[in-house]
Regions:
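Glycine-rich FAD pyrophosphate-binding loop
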Residues: 147-167
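An anion/pyrophosphate-binding glycine-rich loop and adjacent beta-alpha core
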Residues: 341, 350-488
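Active-site- and interface-proximal helix/loop "cap" or "latch" segments in soluble metabolic
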Residues: 21-116
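A glycine-rich dinucleotide-binding beta-alpha-beta segment and adjacent secondary-structure elements
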Residues: 277, 481, 492-577
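Helical element adjacent to the flavin cofactor pocket in flavoenzyme catalytic cores
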Residues: 248-303, 341, 347
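Beta1/beta-strand and adjacent pyrophosphate-binding region of the FAD-binding site
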Residues: 118-137, 153
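Conserved N-terminal/central alpha/beta ligand/cofactor-binding core
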Residues: 160-268, 274, 389, 396, ...
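Glycine-rich loop(s) and the adjacent beta-strand/alpha-helix scaffold that form part
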Residues: 293-296, 300-367, 586, 595
Length: 606
């Protein structure tokens, strides 16, 4: 009898192991949690389905579409991220790993690596011009050259050109466009040049800046010619004119218009192909060696190479080299890993050191513990509200009004250099922001133009719940006294800082950094809150030094024959801090693509 019972039990366990079970797990993607369902039968992963998520259609949607099938096919979680969607990919892989654990299985049994089919294969290709990167600068140059009949080959590291920042951002600044003319708005090259030159204090190349600004309008018209629909955005940050354009065409649809126009003009495109090494002969650049997604090597011979890889947001080593061992949460393309900088320097190019900066997040602070930056969590938003901010020691470190007024540029630069920063508020502040909103709480100040455009009528109704969630995740704290609050993140100077700050609030004058008194809101009624932030950025600035026509220069300030740069890889076009005119980075990137194309065409004709 006992033998029968044991046999039945063993059979039951075997059937349980063999029967299909569905396990639910989640991973943190770029925009929040990604829910994943994993079906496991007899120790085999038979299905992976991605459910509720807030990822962008491009590039996140590419990973959501491709990765589950690859996991099932290879029975492995030791997979490379889908190119261009690293955060989304890692979230899916993390969720599947958790599901494997929940099934009582060992994740290490699901880490088999599969050799890439093309490893060891070397192929040759030729083109008149090779463009590395299919973003704003790269594709403007590509279409311009292809429409002139030039043999152009674009190589893009991502699985689609849609991974590039240029096709995912809010839109470019530009001058003299048909969009402006249709609304009776006048924005001239002179207006933009004067403001950008003043921002840069002449650290950008004035000749180059002048030439690129003159091409920004052409870039808008080129995009419209592809079928993209554009409109004129309001002047949110007080430039005094409406230079920034937006897109009526949905973000996920934009790349298709650009790619179609390029291919119809006779251009060639290779996605999943990363530039690795410039080919040189006698000091001249004569092509590029690239690595394809299947592991094969592609040597491309060309008369000209244009580097337009989008900066280095995905390269923590470069970030640490310039700003120390800090965390910068990426809001833009993490495939931009400084390839142009590395390849250019290997070929003898000079860096434009003065332009290394970042395009900071104008919508709030961020913290990796909370998934980076989450628009849905109001606790992140108060990082740009102009209240008291302190460093890890608990001391103020700048005039916080810059965060409320110029978060993209000057304010963002300050917190980038702080590494971590913290907002400290009381219950009165929290209740007010959640019930009436910041702009109204501050008395609807007439002298805060940016607030009237970006904060008016914005009420963070769920702020209390958002703070509670932040506390649970470990990037915020709550206490009944400032002394207790200081212990949450170990801030010895916080009690003294709050005491002095409250005195400034009572006097109506900031004796330390002379902040606009409108933003002097006291911290007096408990419970008190502290929220920890890390810097976040849409893109990076700082790249190769070029001449006024985007030819890359060597240490003797002479052009390297055959080598050009566009977009943020063209270090001489940008400055530190970032320009204050909204949309400048991508506007100049678009314009630089057209100028680079014209320079290349002229040089090839000589």
């Amino acid at each position: 009898m006992k033998q029968w019972i044991c046999l039945i039990l063993a059979l039951s366990m075997l059937l349980a192991c063999a029967s299909a079970e569905v396990y639910e797990a989640a991973g943190t993607g770029k925009n929040g949690d990604i829910k994943v369902s994993v079906t496991i039968e007899g120790g085999k992963i038979t299905d992976v389905s991605v459910g509720e998520n807030t990822e962008d259609a491009i590039p996140g949607g590419v990973a959501i579409e491709q990765l589950p099938g690859i996991i099932v096919e290879r029975q492995s979680i030791a997979l490379d991220a889908v190119t261009g969607a690293t955060l989304t990919s890692n979230a899916i892989l993390s969720a599947v790993e958790q599901a494997i654990k929940d099934a009582g299985l060992n994740p290490d049994d699901y880490r088999a690596t599969v050799a890439k089919a093309g490893e060891g294969v070397v192929e040759e290709e030729h083109a008149k011009v090779v463009i590395v990167g299919a973003g704003a600068g790269g594709m403007m140059a590509a279409i311009t050259l292809a429409r002139r009949g030039v043999d152009v080959l674009v190589i893009e590291k991502g699985a689609t050109i849609g991974v590039a920042n240029g096709w995912n951002c809010g839109g470019p600044m530009a001058s003299n466009t048909s969009v402006q003319a249709a609304e009776g708005v006048k924005v001239t090259d002179e207006m933009l040049f004067n403001d950008l030159t003043e921002d840069a204090y002449l650290t950008s190349d004035s000749r180059l800046l002048r030439r690129v600004i003159a091409k920004t309008g052409e870039a808008v018209e080129l995009q419209i010619s592809t079928g993209l629909e554009m409109y004129l955005r309001p002047d949110n940050y007080g430039a005094g004119y409406r230079s920034r354009h937006g897109y009526n065409t949905a973000k996920a649809d934009r790349p298709a218009f650009i790619e179609k126009a390029y291919l119809e003009a006779g251009g060639r495109l290779l996605c999943g192909t990363a530039g690795e090494t410039l080919l040189t002969e006698g000091g001249k650049v004569v092509g590029i060696q690239a690595k394809r997604e299947d592991g094969s090597t592609l040597n491309i011979r060309a008369d000209a190479v244009l580097l337009a890889t989008g900066g280095y947001l995905g390269n923590q080593d470069i970030v640490h080299e310039h700003w120390g061992n800090i965390t910068v949460n990426a809001l833009g393309n993490t495939l931009s890993t400084g390839d142009a900088i590395r390849m250019g320097q290997e070929a003898g190019a000079l860096l434009e050191e003065s332009s290394f900066a970042m395009i900071s997040n104008e919508f709030g602070g961020s913290n990796r513990k909370g998934g980076g930056w989450q628009r849905s969590n109001g606790a992140m938003t108060i990082g740009i509200y102009g209240g008291m901010l302190v460093d890890p020691n608990g001391e103020r470190f700048f005039n916080e009004y810059y965060m409320a007024n110029q978060p993209l540029s000057v304010g963002g630069e300050a917190v980038l250099r702080a590494g971590k920063f913290y907002a400290v508020v009381d219950q009165i502040y929290v209740d007010a922001i959640a019930s009436e909103g910041l702009f109204e709480f501050l008395g609807a100040p007439e002298d805060w133009y940016v607030g009237s455009m970006t904060a008016k009528g914005v009420v963070l109704e769920n702020l209390q719940e958002d703070l509670d969630k932040a506390i649970e995740q470990g990037w915020a704290g709550k206490a009944d006294s400032i002394e207790e609050l200081a212990e949450v993140f170990g801030m010895p100077e916080l009690p003294h800082t709050v005491e002095m700050y409250n005195a400034y609030c009572e006097a109506g004058h900031d004796e330390e950094y002379f902040k606009n008194p409108t933003f002097l809101t006291p911290i007096t009624k408990g419970p008190f809150y502290v929220v920890e932030y890390e810097p976040s950025a849409w893109s990076t600035l700082g790249g190769l030094r070029t001449d006024s026509r985007l030819r890359v220069l060597n240490a003797d300030l002479m052009p390297i024959s055959g080598l050009y740069a566009a977009g943020v890889d063209a270090g001489s076009l940008y400055c530190q801090p970032y320009y204050q005119v909204e949309g400048t980075a991508v506007g100049l990137a678009f314009g630089s693509g057209i100028l680079a194309a014209e320079t290349i065409a002229s040089d090839l004709a000589d």
